[in-house]
Amino acid sequence: MKNVFLALESGSMEQQRKKKSVAYAIIITAVALMISLSVFLISGLVSLFGGKSEKPNKDNNSLFETTTTVFEGSQKDNGSLLLLDDNHPYRGTSEIILIRDAKDRPKTDGGPYVYTIGGTPYLGATTETISAFNQMMADFYAHPSSGKDDNIYIDKACNITSASQSELFASGLCLALTYYENYNVDSSIRPSIYGVEKYKWIYDNAHKYGFIQLYPATTEDGSTADANIFRYVGIPHATYIKQNKISFEEYLTALSATTPSNPISINTVDGNKYIYYIPADGEHVIPKNNTYSISGDNKGGYIITVNADVSI
């Protein structure tokens, strides 16, 4: 070390200054390297002996952050996306309201209601179903193509006084629509609205209100006789079904292949949505920072619809 200092003090003043500058630079570099090495070693030890290191799923993280919860048992039997048939009976507990009592039921310019309810006053539907239907009927009546038509007739819905009805109508999600062909002559004649030009607007726009034509005549299950049955599923689901020209059952099959990190993504009149499926034995993953809705599928699984544009 003594020799080092002697070397630094030898030579002219200018030579000594240059030697000292080089020496200081070497010392500073060595100290910096030692500090960096220490930080690296400490970080490695923390990680090795219990330090937490989160590894978010990149695909999932690019869409929405998630967390987990435990769904209530009744949620698997409720919602707008239940499979309903003879093998999958309705077991839900959704509130059914009388259609006649809906406060937002639209009226014509002259005062009467835009549509008529079937022969019994006890036809009902879920709040979401009838609210969406009322908005659709108000817009239909106001559209130039309707000619201010007020002959629509809800021929069939959930009959709250009858136990002998199909699973579809018992759910309060389905409405069968007919119309008065000769309202002032014979009110008993009520054909299906299917195939009638002035009601084409309803078929073209129902998805914007959350409805699907339950049995399109073009599908395997379709028939002209049932082509006037509309089911409420919600705007994003109705939009996807309409755009992809598939049946409700085919949509449920498509959903079964989705996950929180690989959802269906769709842009609707109601905003951007992510939709994914959780199987019966799957972890209950939900968005952490976005609002969402849950529907059972009546097979034990759950369908989560995330509002991509709405944060909590």
Question: What are these model-derived regions, one by one?
Answer:
Residues 4-32, 36-312:
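Extracytoplasmic cell-surface/polysaccharide-interacting catalytic and binding patches
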